[in-house]
A protein has these predicted regions:
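Active-site neighborhoods and metal-handling regions in enzymes and metal-associated proteins
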Residues: 1-362
Length: 362
């Protein structure tokens, strides 16, 4: 990414800060720092003002910051980052500076207000998250690539998914393939692989439990490329499955298809969630669908906006969302089907190519 690419983002943030009567912002969330200047390390603070953007880190990241940081003056020091701001006189008395309260602990705020005691501090939670909701061309390209890697890995893993194979073997193979086809940091999140009773646990951690006959199997996983995430879920039945297990699969698939058909720019997230929720409720499984329909993707696996029954968000073009209804019935098993989509003016573009047809494993 070019210097100009990140400077555009910084300029947009400065304009938004000005509307809040703020002279700048202290950014401590590492994902937000990456979004604003490109740094991928694990310790940094970004100070953005109208006059200058300063990137603060320590001696471990001299080479990395020289290579990665765009549109900011790099300051290397071993003392706490807030103290660097004071030491370098980067702010003047009575300036009003924003910070994100979701990413500053109580102790951190006490330290910040003590070190910068003559600065007016204001919590402006969510300002960068809202900027990041709509994806630009480069971001969409990265997400498309992450989804393609996910599809490729699933295609290679599926032939080894058989009765008698352990959950963790499948999860480990997916992780290996993401690194084979992607970059060095290629797992979007720890894969969820649940079979039998474990399939009814939405966030199950893979174990040495083996796939058995007459069961449901859920595989939820995704690759990451250039920092951007993919997230896909497919569900399967094994030989000897019951009529109810097949029925649950069909209900979830239909709920997902109908939800995606309802998506377009300016639709409320709550209304899209209700399409799937109402369909599943009418099929008699209301109490077994107990999570939101989906969430946004980007430099984090879970971002706003979200499809949920309490969401107040409205969809805009180039939002990237997951659509993932599920039914989880103890003693019967669970089904979740998930795709990543791009919101368009008149609909949704489904990125995943992996089949959603009912498949039986033997």
């Amino acid at each position: 990414m070019s210097v100009e690419y990140f400077q555009r983002r910084q300029h947009i943030l400065i304009e938004k800060l000005a509307k809040e009567n703020l002279d700048g912002m202290i950014v401590t969330n590492l994902t937000h720092i990456r979004y604003l200047c490109g740094f991928t390390g694990s310790s940094a603070t970004l100070l953005i003002t109208v006059d200058q953007v300063h990137f603060i880190t320590d001696g471990r990241y001299v080479v990395q910051s020289e290579k990665e940081v765009k549109g900011a003056k790099v300051l290397i020091d071993s003392i706490p980052h807030y103290e660097v701001i004071q030491k370098q006189n980067l702010l003047t008395s009575s300036q009003s500076i924003g910070f994100d309260g979701n990413n500053v602990s109580h102790q951190g705020y006490q330290q910040l207000s003590k070190v910068l005691s003559d600065i007016n501090l204001k919590n402006i939670t969510g300002i960068i998250e809202k900027m990041a909701m709509s994806k630009d061309k480069k971001e969409l390209e990265a997400i498309r690539t992450a989804v393609e890697i996910t599809d490729t890995a699933f295609a290679e893993v599926l032939p080894m998914v058989k009765i008698g194979v352990e959950e963790k073997v499948i999860a480990n193979q997916l992780s290996f393939l993401y690194r084979k086809y992607g970059d060095s940091d290629s797992d979007a999140f720890a894969a969820i692989v649940g079979t039998g009773p474990n399939s009814a646990k939405p966030h199950h951690k893979p174990t040495d439990r083996k796939i058995g006959p007459g069961e449901l199997l859920v595989i939820d996983s995704g690759a990451k490329f250039a920092g951007y995430h993919a997230d896909m879920t497919r569900s399967f039945a094994t030989k000897g499955y019951s009529d109810e297990q097949k029925s649950i699969y069909d209900i979830v698939l239909n709920a997902q298809v109908k939800s995606i058909e309802g998506i377009k720019s300016r639709m409320s997230c709550k209304s899209i969630d209700s399409i799937a929720r109402d369909y599943i409720a009418n099929a008699g499984y209301s109490k077994f669908f107990d999570h939101g329909l989906g969430h946004s993707l980007g430099l984090e696996i879970h971002q706003d906006p979200r499809f949920s029954k309490v969401s107040e968000d409205v969809l805009e073009e180039n939002y990237v969302m997951t659509v993932e209804p599920g039914i989880y019935v103890p003693d019967i098993g669970g089904v979740r089907i998930e795709d990543d989509i791009i919101v368009t003016k008149n609909g949704a573009e489904i990125l995943n190519k992996t089949s959603k047809e009912f498949q039986v494993i033997s």
